[in-house]
Amino acid sequence: MGRVGYWTLLVLPALLVWRGPAPSAAAEKGPPALNIAVMLGHSHDVTERELRTLWGPEQAAGLPLDVNVVALLMNRTDPKSLITHVCDLMSGARIHGLVFGDDTDQEAVAQMLDFISSHTFVPILGIHGGASMIMADKDPTSTFFQFGASIQQQATVMLKIMQDYDWHVFSLVTTIFPGYREFISFVKTTVDNSFVGWDMQNVITLDTSFEDAKTQVQLKKIHSSVILLYCSKDEAVLILSEARSLGLTGYDFFWIVPSLVSGNTELIPKEFPSGLISVSYDDWDYSLEARVRDGIGILTTAASSMLEKFSYIPEAKASCYGQMERPEVPMHTLHPFMVNVTWDGKDLSFTEEGYQVHPRLVVIVLNKDREWEKVGKWENHTLSLRHAVWPRYKSFSDCEPDDNHLSIVTLEEAPFVIVEDIDPLTETCVRNTVPCRKFVKINNSTNEGMNVKKCCKGFCIDILKKLSRTVKFTYDLYLVTNGKHGKKVNNVWNGMIGEVVYQRAVMAVGSLTINEERSEVVDFSVPFVETGISVMVSRSNGTVSPSAFLEPFSASVWVMMFVMLLIVSAIAVFVFEYFSPVGYNRNLAKGKAPHGPSFTIGKAIWLLWGLVFNNSVPVQNPKGTTSKIMVSVWAFFAVIFLASYTANLAAFMIQEEFVDQVTGLSDKKFQRPHDYSPPFRFGTVPNGSTERNIRNNYPYMHQYMTKFNQKGVEDALVSLKTGKLDAFIYDAAVLNYKAGRDEGCKLVTIGSGYIFATTGYGIALQKGSPWKRQIDLALLQFVGDGEMEELETLWLTGICHNEKNEVMSSQLDIDNMAGVFYMLAAAMALSLITFIWEHLFYWKLRFCFTGVCSDRPGLLFSISRGIYSCIHGVHIEEKKKSPDFNLTGSQSNMLKLLRSAKNISSMSNMNSSRMDSPKRAADFIQRGSLIMDMVSDKGNLMYSDNRSFQGKESIFGDNMNELQTFVANRQKDNLNNYVFQGQHPLTLNESNPNTVEVAVSTESKANSRPRQLWKKSVDSIRQDSLSQNPVSQRDEATAENRTHSLKSPRYLPEEMAHSDISETSNRATCHREPDNSKNHKTKDNFKRSVASKYPKDCSEVERTYLKTKSSSPRDKIYTIDGEKEPGFHLDPPQFVENVTLPENVDFPDPYQDPSENFRKGDSTLPMNRNPLHNEEGLSNNDQYKLYSKHFTLKDKGSPHSETSERYRQNSTHCRSCLSNMPTYSGHFTMRSPFKCDACLRMGNLYDIDEDQMLQETGNPATGEQVYQQDWAQNNALQLQKNKLRISRQHSYDNIVDKPRELDLSRPSRSISLKDRERLLEGNFYGSLFSVPSSKLSGKKSSLFPQGLEDSKRSKSLLPDHTSDNPFLHSHRDDQRLVIGRCPSDPYKHSLPSQAVNDSYLRSSLRSTASYCSRDSRGHNDVYISEHVMPYAANKNNMYSTPRVLNSCSNRRVYKKMPSIESDV
C-alpha cells in the first residue's frame, strides 16, 4: 500500500498537468501541448521546483507550442529501478520527450536508455553521467541522443595532444570493450594518412578476464613513453596497476585515456597515476542546469519544426507496459528534426550516431594532488593547452625522475632565436627548426591565454642542438612569457633568469648577457659570443638643396664667370668688332655693307652664352680677326667650364645620407640631449643588461631615456626608421645583425659596430646545476673546432656588411631637380613682370621718358645724344636755359633763330605784291608769336589754342577742287610735334636769305631710329657728285666759311630725331580720310575731301598769312610731314580735265643775280656742321676728286670758270658712308642722291631709280631754253629725279591711277598685283609718259643733257624702261604742278622767273599751322606755277633736311627702307 501511495503521489502532478488542459481544449481550441519530462539523479544539488523554473516564458516566447515540464528526481539509478521509473512516468503522464541525467559513470545507463527509446519511440537526451558515456552500437530505430563526443572525436583530440607536444612515438592499448575496434581503426587510419611523422609502435588488445600474468606479458612489449588506452574505467584500474608494476607509469611516461576511462571526475581510483591525461566532456564550463535548458530547447525546437512542416506532433506514449512484440514504427518522428538544431544562438546539432557535432571537450590531467585539473580545451576543432612544456609528475614515491630530459627557456631575438609558425601542411616544424611553445594571451585584462606550438631556429638554437647531441639530453623548449632577459623587480626576478631561478626551467639559452647581478643567482657557461653595448642610428636621406645645381662651383666662380662673360669678354668682343677694319660696324661706316646687320653688345653676350652651354641657338659670328680670336679662346674656356661642371654635378644632385655621429655613451648627445634642437632622443629595451649598465653608470642619462624605451628590438627599429627615435642603445651583436640584414641598409651602428662595455652571451643554468661543466666543455670544443665561427658566418653576417663598399645608385626624382625647376619658374615670373612692364612703359611711361610730361628733352633722347657724342667725339655745348623755354642749348639756338625771324623789320627783299599788303609786317610778327605759343604748349601746335578739330575748307582755288588728297598709310603720335633742332625742315625767306622759317606739322609723329635712318639717308647724298666732276679742285673757302662749317653739330642731317622713313616707306598709299572732332575716328568709307578756301579754325593772323601766301607766287616751304590714321583702302587719283599751263608765268633763272647783291660763289646757304670723318684726311687734290654735277644754272654773262669755282665751293656727302662730296648746295636741304665709289660696289636691298638730277655743265642758256629742254626729261623721270622719290616694288600696285576716261564718281577699289599687270597692258599707263611735242619743240638744248652713268645708278627692282614704270612722273602731274605746287614735292627745281632782279632762290620760313589743314581735308600750301628744281640753299642759313611726309598733305610718297630689319 505504501508503494502504491508513493507512485500515486509521484505521478499525480503529471496527471494533473496532463488532464488539466483537456476541458479547456474542448471548449476552446488552443496550441498543441508538449510534455517534456526531466529525470535527474538525487545526488545533484537541485530540486524539482528549480528544474521546472528552468523553462519560463522567456524561453517559450515565439513557440507555437504549450510546453509543460515534468521534473523527477531519482534516488537509485540501477537498471531495474531506472526502467521502472521511466515506465511509471510514461503511464502516469503522457510525455513527448525525456531529458535524463545521472551521477554514475556506468556506460550501462546509456545502453538501457537506448533500449527504452527504441521500443517506445520517445526521444531521450542523455546529458550527464552514464547517460552520456560512449556507446558503441546503438539501435537504429532509437531516438537516443547524448551530450558527449564519439569515439572518433575523442581519438582526434588525443592525437592532437601528442602532436602539440611532439610525442610522435606512441603505443596503443585497448580491451575488448565495445567500440575498441572503431578506436583502433580510426587511430591507424589517421596516422597512416597524416604528414606528421607518427610512429605507432605497438597495438595491444588485452582481455581482462584472463590472469594478470598474461596482461603483464602484453604490456612488456611497450617501449614508448606515450601510451593511448581505450577501455572502461574498471578495466583501466587493472591495466594501470599492472603497468605500475612494470615501471610504465614513471616520470617519463604519458598515459592518455578517453572520457570512458575518467568517467565521473569525482571518483578517482587510487591506481590512476599522477600525470594521467584524459579527454572528457566539459563539466567545468558547461553546468547541469545549462544542459537541462538546452535539452528542453532541443525538444521544443524539433517539435516546432515538425508542427510547421506536418501540422502535428507525435502522439505521446501512454505506457511502456504491453505486448512483448515490437510495435509499428510511426510514419514521422522527431529524430530527423533533432539532427540539425540551433537554439539560443548555439549549434546543438547531432550526428546520425546520436553524438553532438560540436561537443565541448576539455583536456584534464591528474595532478600531484590527485585531482583532475583542466589544462586544455578543444573547441571549434582547435586545441589550446595551458602548459608550454608538459609537466613531469612524480607518479609514485618509488619512481625516480629522469634527469636527461630538460626544460629549457629561451627568448625570441633574431638572429639568436627566430620564431616561425609551423608548417600548415604537416602541422610540424620543418628541418633545422625545433618545436617550441609560445604563450599567447587571449584576454589582456585577465592574462588568460594559451600556448601555441611554434618553431624556433637561430644561432642559439643551433648551439642547443649541438649541445643536445654532444652532452646527451632531451629537452622541451618554450619561450619566456614576458619576453624579457631577466631583471630583479621588487626582489623578484623576471624573464629567463626568473624561469631558471624558480626552477621552472633547467637552463636558459639565448642572447643572455653575462653580468655580475645575474651571476649571483644563476650559473653562466663560458661566453659563446662576444658582445657589449653599441648604438644604432638611421641613415636619413637628407634633402637636396634647391641650389644644388649651382654647388659644383663656388659663388666666386659663378660671379667671375658672369663677370668675364658680361663685362670683360662680351664687351671686348663688341669693341674689337666695332673698331675692326673688317668688322660689321666699320664696314657700315665706310659704306661697304649698307643696310646690313650690326654687331651689338647683346649679340656678343648671346654668342658667348650659347658657346658656354652648347645651346643650338642662332648667333651672329663676328667678322673681325681680333674678335674671332677672343671668341675662340672663350670657346676653349667654355669646354673646360662645362666639362668641370658636368663632372661635379652628379655628386651634388644625389641625396646625401645623414648619420648622427656618436662617439660613445659619454657623448654630449647622450649626456646633454637638451642642448640640441630638437632634443636628441635615444632609448633601449628595459629589464636588460644594457639598461642596468646605463642606470649604474649614467643616472641622468638613464632618467632621460626612460620615456623613449622600446618594448623590443623590432619596435625600436621601426621607431628609428620613422624618426621617432634618433639612437637605439642595445647589445652590439644584435644591432650588428639587424644592421646587416636591414632592408635598404638604412640602419647602421656607430663606428662600424664599435662596442662599449664589452662582455659576452652565455647559457644560464640553475645554481649548482650538474650540467654546467659538460656544457662549458662542449662550447669550448665548438670554438676550437671552428664550428662556432661557421655559425657566426651563417647567422651573424648580413648582406649590408658584404655590400657596404658597393655604390648604390638611384634615380633622380623631383627633389633632386627642384632647383632647376625653381629657376625656370622664376624666369617665367620675371618674363611676365618684364612683359607687363614693357606694356606699361610703352602705353604709359614712354611719354615721360621722351619729354612729354616735362618741358625738358626726354631721357632717352638725352642718352642717345650723349652716346653718339661719346662714340663720334662730338662735343655738345651746354648753354644756358632760356627763361621762356626750358630746353637744351641747341634748342635755345633754335629759339633765338625763331625770335629773329619774328622780329624781321627789313622788307626790302619782298616782292611788290607783298610789300603792298598792310598786314605783312604784322603777319611776320604774329607768326612768330604763334610759334612761341606752340613752344609754350610743349611743342604741340595742334592744341596751342585748345581748339577742337573742325572741318577745313580747301585753300586751293576753284580750279583745284577736283584734286584728290593722299596720305601715307601711317599714324604718327604727338611726340613728333616737338620743336627740336635737327627735326624740322627749314626754308629760306625769299626776301631775306638770312631769315629762316620752320614748318611744324599739325599731326603727331612716331619715333623711329633717327640716326640709322639719317645715316642711310645721308648716305645717298654722297653718291656721284665727285665722280662726275672731271676736274678735281680744292675748295677755296674763305675763313668765314670754314668758321661756319664747324659750328653747332646738332644740325647734322643725322639728327632727324623723329623721322621714320623706314616705316612710311612700306605703307600703301591711301585716301586720307577727313578727321572730325570725334577723337580722330577712322572711317571705312571713302569720302571725297571737301575743299574750302581757308581753315575755319585758323586765327586771324593765320588767315592774314594765308591770304598773303596765296598772292605770292614764289613762296616755298618745307614741311615736317605728319600723318593721321589712314583708311586702309586705295582709290586711284582723280584728275581734273583740261588743265592748262598758265601762259603768263615766267620762269626766272634760279641762280641769276644781275644786281650782284651777294657773292656769286655763295649760291647756297652755309651749313653749321662738322667735317666728315674722311674729309680732313684727304689731300688737297683728292679731297674733291669725287665732285659730280649739280643742279645749278650759270648766269648768262658769267664765264664757265666762275661757274666751276662756285660749284667747288659747295659740297655734298655720300648717302651711304657720309663722306664729303662737293659741288652740291643742298647738303642739308634734302637727302643726297649720290654715293661714293666705295658704296657703289655694295648692292642695296631695294634698287633705287636715281637717274641724275643734275646735268652736265653745258653752254649758258636762258631760263626759257632751260625750261623747254628740261621739260620732257622731268616729265619722264617722275618726281623722284627731283626729290629722290624712291618707290617699292611690292607697294606700287596701291597707287594705280584711274584712266582719264573713268567717271570721277565711280567708287574706289583695291587692285592686286595680278590685276595690276593686266591693267598695265593697253590702258592709260601705256601712254602715260608721252611728252607733249609742244614742250619738246624748243630749239635750245638742256643745260645738262647727260644723265647719270649706269655705274652710278642703283640697280632697281622696278622696270628699266620708263614706259613700263607706272610710278614715273606724268604729264598730268606737271599740269597739276602748274596750277598749284603739290605739297608732296618738298624738293623741286625752281622755275625760270620773269623777274630779273629776283635772281636767287629765296624761301620764306612760315608756320605750317597757319596754313596747313589739321584734318587733312585739303592741300595746305598755295603753290605757284613752276617747274621745280632743287633749291639752292644759302650758306648763311641753317636748316635740316625736311621730313619725308607731311600729315597736312595727302600725297604719294615712296621712300627707301634703310635696313633689312625694318622691312622683315
Curated annotation (Swiss-Prot):
Effect recorded for residue 705 to V: In FESD; decreased localization to the cell membrane; changed glutamate-gated calcium ion channel activity characterized by decreased glutamate potency and decreased open probability
Outcome of mutating residue 818 to E: In FESD; likely pathogenic
Effect of substituting residue 989 to S: Found in a patient with neonatal onset epileptic encephalopathy; uncertain significance
Signal peptide per UniProt: 1-22
Site (Functional determinant of NMDA receptors): 614
Effect of residue 615 to K: In FESD; likely pathogenic; results in loss of voltage-dependent inhibition by Mg(2+); the mutant receptor has decreased calcium permeability; shows a dominant-negative effect
Effect caused by changing residue 506 to A: In FESD; no effect on localization to the cell membrane; changed glutamate-gated calcium ion channel activity characterized by increased glutamate potency
Effect of residue 189 to N: Found in a patient with schizophrenia; uncertain significance
Effect recorded for residue 1074 to L: Found in a cutaneous malignant melanoma sample; somatic mutation
Chemical reaction(s) catalysed: Ca(2+)(in) = Ca(2+)(out); Na(+)(in) = Na(+)(out); K(+)(in) = K(+)(out)
Membrane topology reported for the UniProt record: Multi-pass membrane protein
GO molecular function, one term: glutamate-gated calcium ion channel activity
CDD domains associated with the record: PBP1_iGluR_NMDA_NR2, PBP2_iGluR_NMDA_Nr2
Effect of residue 552 to L: No effect on localization to the cell membrane. Changed glutamate-gated calcium ion channel activity characterized by increased desensitization
Outcome (variant: residue 784 to A): Found in schizophrenia; uncertain significance; unchanged function in ion transmembrane transport; unchanged agonist potency and unchanged channel activation by glutamate
Mutagenesis / variant outcome for changing residue 727 to T: In FESD; decreased protein abundance; decreased localization to the cell membrane; decreased function in ion transmembrane transport; changed glutamate-gated calcium ion channel activity characterized by decreased glutamate potency and decreased open probability
Effect of residue 184 to S: In FESD; uncertain significance; no effect on function in ion transmembrane transport when expressed in Xenopus oocytes; has no effect on channel basal gating properties and activation by glutamate and glycine
Annotated region described as Disordered, given as residue ranges: 997-1083, 1335-1372
Binding-site list for Zn(2+): 44, 128, 266, 282
Residues noted as binding L-glutamate in the record, renumbered to the chain: 511, 513, 518, 689-690, 731
Result, substituting residue 231 to Y: In FESD; uncertain significance; severely decreased function in ion transmembrane transport when expressed in Xenopus oocytes; decreased localization to cell membrane; changed glutamate-gated calcium ion channel activity characterized by decreased glutamate and glycine potency
Activity control summary: NMDA glutamate receptor activity is inhibited by endogenous Mg(2+) in a voltage-dependent manner. NMDA glutamate receptor activity is inhibited by endogenous Zn(2+). NMDA glutamate receptor activity is inhibited by endogenous protons.
Function: Component of N-methyl-D-aspartate (NMDA) receptors (NMDARs) that function as heterotetrameric, ligand-gated cation channels with high calcium permeability and voltage-dependent block by Mg(2+). NMDARs participate in synaptic plasticity for learning and memory formation by contributing to the slow phase of excitatory postsynaptic current, long-term synaptic potentiation, and learning.
Subunit details: Heterotetramer. Forms heterotetrameric channels composed of two GluN1/zeta subunits (GRIN1), and two identical GluN2/epsilon subunits (GRIN2A, GRIN2B, GRIN2C or GRIN2D) or GluN3 subunits (GRIN3A or GRIN3B) (in vitro). Can also form heterotetrameric channels that contain at least two GluN1 subunits and at least two different GluN2 subunits (or a combination of one GluN2 and one GluN3 subunits) (in vitro). In vivo, the subunit composition may depend on the expression levels of the different subunits. Found in a complex with GRIN1, GRIN3A and PPP2CB. Found in a complex with GRIN1 and GRIN3B.
Protein name in UniProt: Glutamate receptor ionotropic, NMDA 2A
Gene name linked to the record: GRIN2A
